Structure formats: C-alpha cells, structure tokens
Amino acid sequence: MSALGQFKRWAVRLGAVALAASAAMPASARVSTGVHPYIEVQQVLNADLDSGETLTYTAVAAGVDAGVSTRRVRAQISYRYEKRFGWGDDLVDGDSHTGIAQLSADLIPNMLRASAGALATRARSDGVGPIFGFTNVDDPAISEVYSFYAGPELSTRIGALNVTGSYRFGLVEVDNKALRGLPLAPGAILLDRFDSSTNHSLSASVGMDVGELPFGWTVGGGYFLEEADRLDQEFEARFIRGDVVVPVGSTLALTAGVGYEKIESSQQDILRDAAGRPVVTPGGRLIGDPTKPRLLAYETDGIIWDAGVIYRPSRRTELQARVGQRYGGTTVTASLSHKINERYGLSASIYDGVETFGRLLIADLAAVPVEFDIRRNPLNNNVGGIGGCVFGTDPGTGACFDDAFQSIAGSSFRNRGANILFSGGRGPWGFGIGANYSSRRYYQPIVEQGFALDRRTDESFGLYAGATRDLSRTSTVSLDAYANWFDSGLTGAESAFSTGITGGYYQSFLFDRLQAHAALGLFTTDNGEFDSTVASALVGLRYGF
C-alpha cells in the first residue's frame, strides 16, 4: 500500500476511534460532542491586474468539522475535499484535500496516554518560491502533503522518582506528480525533492524533583530513525544525557546538562552515464544506484552540553534560555509562554537542530493543540487559512508550519530560527498573529555533479494575521493578511516575496443550516522573473447537516 493510502486509512481510523470513544463513555462523563458535515458550492473569479487575464472556476466541496471532549478523550477534526471546475481552456479542473485532526486519549488516567494526529495540506515544493500564498488550482509547483503520527506516552511516579517514556510513529507523503512530469529546462538545477518517509521516535527518562534533594535531576535518552523513499535515504539519531536544576530563588533556577549524541544521515549514490553525468528522469529527478556503496551526507558524534536559566515569576509566565555546544558549534535555544490574562496569550521560541522535512513536519503537527481554531480562509483553503499557522482555542497556543514547509527537500539540514504566536479575543472579537524566521543549511554527499543543495543556506520569513468579529448571532466578518519572503540560496536564483489580504462576510439562515458567504482578496508575488498582482472574488453557499 502506498504512503498516501496508509495516510487515508489511518486518518479514517483516527476519526472512528474518537467517535467510538465518545459513544463508549457514559452520558454523565460527556462534556461535549459535535459532528458537523456540510456541502458547499462556490463561484470564484481571479483577475491578474498586470496581464489582464481573468480566470473563473466553480468549486464544489464536502467536509466535516467535528469535536469530542470527555474526561478521558479529546479529539477534533476539520477536513474538506474540494473539486474545482475551470471555465475555459486556461484553467484545468482539479481537486484537493485539506484538513487537520488531533486525538488525545487517557488509556490509564495520570499514567498512560495515546496521541495521534493527521494533516492534509498544500504547499510549494519546487524550492524556489514562498511557502504559502495565492496559487491557481493547476499550478504544478503546488503539491499535496499528507502526514500522520500516533503513539503512547507514559508519565508516572515510582516512589520519589518521575518516570517518563514515549514512542511515536510518523508517516509523511508528498504528492508532487504534476511537478515530476514537467520537462527539465536547459541549465536547470537538479533538486532532490522529497517523496515519502516513515519515522520512529523513542525516548525515556527518570528523575527527581527539587525537595528530596536541594536540586532536581533527570537522566534520559532517545532514539530516532527515518527512512525515506528517495535514494533510500536514512536519518538516524541517538543521545543520552543528564540534567540538573538548581533553584536560586523563588522564581529563578539554574539548569545545566551534559551527554553524548550521534547523528548520521546517508543515502544511495546516484546513477551516472558513461561520461559521469547524473542520469535523471524527464522531470529532473535523480535516480539511485543500489550497486554502489552508500554515501554519507552528515555525521556528528561526541559530547554535548548546555546551561541556562528557568524563570517563573508567576503561574502565567515561564521563560527558559540555554546556550551550549552541539552539532560541532554553539547552540542557543529559548522558549517563552505568557498568559497576559484569561483572554490573551503569547508564546515564542528560538530553535536550533539538525532535521529532515519528515521529522520536522511530524514535530510541528504534534505541537498543534487538540482544541484548535478550525476557521479557514475562503480564498485559500489551506490548513489554517492562507498562512502557515494553526492557533489553539487557548490564547497564545498553536503551531506554525513555516519551518517545515520552507523547502520540501529530501536532504537533512541544520535548522535555526525563531517564531512567535499571539492570540486571543474579547466579546465578539477574535484574532491570531504568527511570525517565523528560519534558516537552513543543507547537508548532502560531497560528490562531483549531482547535489545542488550541499552546504547551501536558504532563509524564509513569514508573518500572518487574522481577525474575526461577530456582527450578530448569525453574521460574521473576517480579515486575513500575510507576507512571505524566501531566498533559496541557489546560484542565479533571486529571492521571492508575496503578500495577500482577504476580507470575508458570512450570513446564516434556516436555523443556521444554510450559510451564504462572500470574500474579496488582493495578492502579490515578486520573484524577480515573474511578478503578478491578482484580485480575487468569491461568492458561495454552504449547507450543514
């Protein structure tokens, strides 16, 4: 079975498990359960203000928004399938799957929990443009991306000891068949694009809180393995380390840790012709040669350490910051969580790690809260709307996918950057703001002709903002805006910049079963070779069951 087939099977099982768990709970234990399927029809017009070209299509969609919340099970899913029919010969028909699902179930209360999640979205996969933004339905650079994860988590106490353990299985599939079919342009750079991967993550720790001793301590270890289809790539990481936390006041503690880590990334050599040139498919894909020895793309093996502070001035605020040695150089990481009040929250982080696309996407998906905001942008039905952030219903929580979707490449890379989320609401107002900066340095085998990304660095910055206001019980307005900048770092390639703003209006009728909506948007793209300004308009009707 293909990875895409496995994704669909597991996504269906995820929803079935959540609903079955809800049905199995006694009525007194239920908090809330809601399943809201719908069908929808839209008429969309896109006008390129630079060329004067106008494209029109009709979209027919079916989807479901559902949530379950009990004492032991919490789950939520937002899924949408859309079929688009182009008017005229300039826009071909197409379809798309978009959605996100999360599940958390307490198998043994206060001891063993199972978590699972699934994602279906669309993102640019040619490595030369902004991550998210306005695109036509038949843009071959846009790929369908599917991912799924599941696993148990153990957290318990044995006497004075805290014992934790977890296992997580992850699956990622990128459907970029349209891009594969394009002929390779003369002089084009060969990019090793991602296809699919499976990964396994295992961790365990034992420790003691401050109290039994004047300091807290933890000893733990972990193992990670990812196997990708392209060129039989393999990423393997293992570590063991010990950490201590020493309070120096009621709100401040010092922390330090030391350990050992080994990371190795390898893959097949590439097939070459008699002249030593790489053999590629008509779409520019490299072909592996299993008869040759495997190539090492990245390796680190040695002692790691870091030290820092933990600051908790109140139950609403926590700041952690660390500096150390890892990956052969200095690392700096930090995190901040601050509840301004019950209505507004803020979170931020500075990150540094060696990653792969599959590993990073699964980590981002697992960071999405179970209770998330299911609102979508009407002119770009991507996960989380136009931008790459999904906000939790708890103010200041959520996850941004920009660091994963910066480039859908098959290589391992050093990933450094920062992100910030600010969200909340009061009365009829609700809003979310997210920003992310990410820099990647790629690692590929050092061979003559064949790998274009080795030791190259790309960068991206994304800013997203969205707000809604309820005008009445049956009417709502929304406003969304984004700005993306991306520099691929490839020789001869210029940086790309895109912006967009969308406004929408929603009106419900017939006991809230029928909803009419309209939206207007303006989108710009500038990548040096191609500039465009597109105005978009939409009217639609949705019927909920």
Spell out what each predicted region is.
Residues 2-14:
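Bacterial N-terminal signal peptides that target proteins for export
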Residues 28-545:
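Gram-negative and organellar
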